Structure formats: structure tokens, C-alpha cells
Amino acid sequence: MRPLTANRPKVMLPIANRPIVEHLLLELREAGIGEFIFIVGYCDEQVRSYFSAGEKWGVSIAYSDQRKQLGTADAIRQVGGMVDGNFIVVNGDVVVDRVDIEKLMTGKHNTMSVIEVKDPRGLGMVEIAGGKVVNIHEKTENPPSVMANAGLYLFTPAVFDAIERTEKSPRGEYEITESLKILMQSGDGLYCQELRSWLDLSYPWDLLAANESMLAGLEPQNLGEVESNVVLRGPVAVGRGTVVRSGAYIVGPVIIGENCDVGPNCYIRPSTAIGDGCHIGAAVEVKNSIIMKNTKIPHFNYVGDSVIGEGCNLGAGTKIANLRLDKKNVRVAGIDTRRRKLGAILGDHVETGINASINVGCTVGNNTFLGPGVVASGVILPDSQIF
């Protein structure tokens, strides 16, 4: 997820103007869960500050610190004294549905949620027989299955015994997959439940798919000021203190945060999320993108299929390409994104000069300056100055 996680934990990356983990919390709450334990480590103060004890969401949140990254099994071991009876464990970087959670909660046995996938890259794949998991393949090429471990589990207290029997892996972690294999071979085994929907957020461009999914159910709302001669088509949500100026043409689903200045005469296209304090100015077009808070895209810019970090400033005439001339899939750092259209991934506090051009799949690190007329492509490291 770098450069987007250089200043924040992955779970706090925004989709539809909420952190990933907030979407997860809301689905779990709607499924009837009211007590949460957040296992935190990197940049934990951001999670604590945002969620506190959970009062805003009508739930109770406790915290467990994993200061050394020793694996998921180690993280679960830490909360052994904080849970009683069966409990749900879910990775903080997935999107799951309330209905699937409710179904999982009716179980009585150790259960792994699984999902059929077309692209197994980077995923743990499982083999299933008779409603149980019989084999696990951790991120292997050409796995003999299309079912992936979805990172959502129902555990009984027996999992803690399995974790105690789990040895440290060659990479120095206590892998939950090894604990799951122990459960497979003992007692009632490891049951499985197939999910109806699921999104895994492994790469920056995965945020765009999740953002589109979350915005699909957006309810129109206007808490700001919309001037005359503004066109709003489809569901558009405008935050408090935001001004949408004359001539703006916005096609939803689009969500605009608080205290933004939008327009005049701009075009915002579907599946766009604009964070708090942003400026989208004259003759600007934004399409299917995530714009994080306090970013300025002020005049004569095109931003499509991109993720733009906090506090960025695009100079006049800066354009981001989002389609290869040969129409092939865009690659980022050699990785096939499986997307024909993908713009750029900009970290926090990136600034560009006038008429800078950013090529498809370009990744720009934090605190980077791209000078006037620069053509940027590939991977640009943080704190770079390119003229």
C-alpha cells in the first residue's frame, strides 16, 4: 500500500470518506456485535484518536498493543484473557457484508470464511471437502483451488491451545495458517462458510474498487451550500461547510467532505470521494478517484482512476493519464493491476508545477516535487525533486 501507508496504518486509509476499519465496524455492529478489541501496532495513535472507546458508534472498544509484529496468531494470543466463549476475528483490511457476519455468528465450531476468487495472487487458498477445510496453500502459484481464506473467522476457545502449539515460522512470526492447520487435525476440525461478497485490500488500486462498491449505496445529502446553475445528477452527498459553485456538474455517486471549495465550472464524475478541506477548481475533471483531505486540484487538471494523498497540490494544467495507448492492463512496479484504466498513486504532500504530466500507473512518494512540464512515470521515491 505504500506510499499511502507511510503516514498511516492501512486500516485508516479512506474509502467513501471513512477509514476501511470503520466500514468494517459498522457492518459488525449491524450484525449485532457491540464489543470490540482492536489489536493495534503501527501508528496506533491514529486508530485510538479516531475511535476512542467507541461511544460515537454505540459500541465498546478496547485495545491490545502488538508492539512486535509477530504474526496474526500472536495477535490473537494477546487477547486470550479479554474474551469469553466463542468470538469473531476479522482482518482489518477487508470489506465484508453484515449478512455473512450474521450467518457466521450462528455457528458453534471453529469456522473459516472463504470466497471464490478469479485472481489468487497474494491470497491464502484453501481446499474444501464435506463443509470443512482440508488443506491450506499460503500464497502459492497455481493453487489447486479457487477458494480463498477471507480473513474472517469464528473461533472457540480451542484456538488458544492451537496457537500455543504453533511454532515460529522461518520469517519469525506465529502464522495463523499454522494454527488453523492444527485445528483442522484436531477435535471437530475446521469448518468453512462461503461468503456472498468480499473485497481484499492488498494494493493501492484495490481502494478504487472498494470505494466504488461503498459509494453504490450512497444516499443524497446536502449539508453545505450549492449555488445556482449547479447540476447534481444521481446520488451526491455534500458535507457541512462545503460550497459548490456555479457551473459545477457532478454525476453521482459522489461524496464530498466538509469545508471543501468546489468549482466553479468543474466536472466530477461517478465513484469519486473527496475528503475534507479539498479544493476542486475551475476547468477540473475528476473521475473515479479518491482525493484525501486538504488536497488542492485548483485549475485545468484531469484526475482519473487515481488515489491522491493528503495535502497535495496540483499545479495548473497538471494531468494524470489513466489509459495506455495500446489499451493493455496498467502495470505498477511490474505488477499487473488487472485494470485497463488506472491513473496514479500519489502519497501525501506531493506538489506539481504547471503542465506536469503523470503517466499511467505512476507511484509518487510523499513530499515530492514534480517541476513544471515534467513527465513522471514509474516509481518515484519519497522526498524527490524532479525538474
Model-derived segments and spans:
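N-terminal nucleotide-binding beta1-loop-alpha1 segment
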Residues: 1-6
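Catalytic-core segments of class I nucleotidyltransferases/pyrophosphorylases
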Residues: 88, 102-105, 132-216
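Glycine-rich hexapeptide-repeat left-handed beta-helix
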Residues: 281-387
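Conserved donor-nucleotide/metal-binding helix-loop-beta segment in metal-dependent transferases, i.e.
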Residues: 98-121
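Anionic-ligand binding region
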Residues: 110, 119-143
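Extended, small-residue-rich solenoid/repeat segments and analogous flexible loops
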Residues: 182-270
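Conserved N-terminal catalytic core of the sugar/cofactor nucleotidyltransferase
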Residues: 13-14, 18-89
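The conserved acidic donor/metal-binding loop of glycosyltransferases
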Residues: 92-95
